[in-house]
Amino acid sequence: QGGAVLSTSLLTSPNIEVDIKSKEVISSVGVTLEALRNEVLKQSNGKLFYPVDPTSRHDAYVGGTISCNASGFIPGESGATRFWVNEIELILPNGNLIKVRRGEHISSDTHFIILDNELEIKVPIPKYKRPDIKNASGPFSNHNGSIDFVDLIVGSEGIFGMLISCKLGLSKKPSNYLELFLCLENEDSAINFHDFLYKYYKKDMSQISALEYFGYNCQNYMKHKDFLFKNKDEV
């Protein structure tokens, strides 16, 4: 009953700081994703980049992308924010400030225990089965009740606490790449093409820098679609 909406757009500290050796970047939550990406390129002299690339990166804030586990053009798990979050700092509902590094706290017996002075707060772990498709809905779960605390926070939309800073992983920026626009006969052909790539790269789709699908509904909003597609069945 009731509640409050908190804006973190003014939380611009700490400053963005890139560690080239560890391929990580410290960031506040109140900067846009585009500002983060540009600063990473600047501090690394174009050698590193932050791969998560949603179409709203000019408007999306770093904290928001973590809260909803935003994803972009990169296929597979590495295209989602969760894959790159190495450390989080957040304020719990009881006012406690905690900093958690990935791998430090793994749930046991289907729950986490947070100590508040002498009080033990038990946080249950969702155990519902997640579908084998791209999915960013709800808190992260595992059928065996064992997950990393960082994964519980990423994508939970702030229900467990308020993010104030983070440490994100970076990737080496490709020096050479080839851009292709492939026109396929229909949606079934597109699925078959994806399956071919999945097998060719031995399930490691991160070897592809970006992969985007333009389906029938999307084409209705495209300019000059007749230049790209011969008929209404092509994708």
Residue ranges and their predicted role:
Residues I191-L211:
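Acidic-enriched catalytic cores of C-N bond-cleaving enzymes acting on peptides and small amides
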Residues V5-S7, I26, F181-C183, A210-E212:
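Short, conserved beta-strand segments within well-ordered enzyme catalytic domains
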Residues Q1-T12, V25-V29, N38-V40:
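Glycine-rich N-terminal segment of FAD-binding domains in flavoprotein oxidoreductases
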Residues I16-S22:
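Acidic/polar active-site rim loop that often engages polyanionic ligands
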Residues Q1, D53-G63, Y213-Q219:
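Short, glycine/charge-rich beta-strand/loop segments that flank catalytic centers
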Residues D204-V235:
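Terminal amphipathic helices with adjacent charged low-complexity linkers/tails
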Residues P14-I16, V29, L33-E34, N38-S189, ...:
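FAD-binding subdomain of flavoenzyme oxidoreductases
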Residues S22-E24, S175-E179, E234-V235:
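Short, solvent-exposed beta-strand edge segments and adjacent coil->beta transition regions
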